Amino acid sequence: MIAVKNVSKSFDGNQVLKNVSTIFETGKTNMIIGASGSGKTVLMKSVIGLHRIDAGRIEYDGRNLPDMKMSNIRTLRREVGMLFQGSALFDSLSVLENVMYPLEMFSLTSKEEMIERAYFCLKHVDLDEKAYGLAPSEISGGMQKRVAIARAIVLQPKYLFCDEPNSGLDPKTSLIIDQLISQITHEFNITTIINSHDMNSVMEIGENIIFIEQGEKAWEGNKDDIFHVDNEALNNFVFASELYKQVKKANQ
């Protein structure tokens, strides 16, 4: 569990997060949604530790991130998996080597065990073994995302952060990626946090949802309630997301 308590953050005198509080639960897909510029990305980066907050607490199972010593932060880094918007794979490495990379970086085990662990994770995301020796540029975008997921879980993380995981993917592939993230979250009991503006993803796998508007938590709840909320900003966001989806579908 990650508890965010009264977190505020400013850049050059501009307050982009204002006393945000929420709980990201273990074993559930927690989603941060909001329009561009709302502060949702700053919130995620603050929770990860990429931005130092001005006020508040970010507690990883009771451990307050801003108070941690560097040695404790290094330990925490091994507990965190990251799924970036653009997959962020190394094309100079094979698919298998990309998944092994975090294990090599932390020197946690033998070469044989690294390979075994990487194979386990790649099989877990249903990637064809024929792709293991290929460079990322030689496989499809959807397959690249599977590799990125495998790499994100290879350290057996307690916490998984996903930044717009469906960016650039077609609807069918997006659904597959959503289902993989949800499956991994529940099977391994991970605290998963997803930064997204994709309402399809929200309705498919969102369990705890926090809506950020102008740096504040404007609404929090579950997907069953999201279309029945008396909140103008949230309603406008949902409408805009649905409109964008229809326009995109019509142009395909």
Protein language model regions, located:
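Catalytic Walker B motif of ABC-type/P-loop ATPase nucleotide-binding domains
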Residues: L160-D163
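Helix N-cap at the start of a conserved alpha-helix in ABC-type nucleotide-binding domains
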Residues: P171-T173
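Helix-to-loop junction immediately C-terminal to a conserved catalytic motif
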Residues: I48
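Conserved ABC transporter NBD signature motif
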Residues: G56-N64
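Conserved ABC ATPase "signature" region
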Residues: E112-K130
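Conserved catalytic motifs of ABC-family nucleotide-binding domains
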Residues: Q156
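Conserved ABC ATPase signature
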Residues: A135-I139, M143
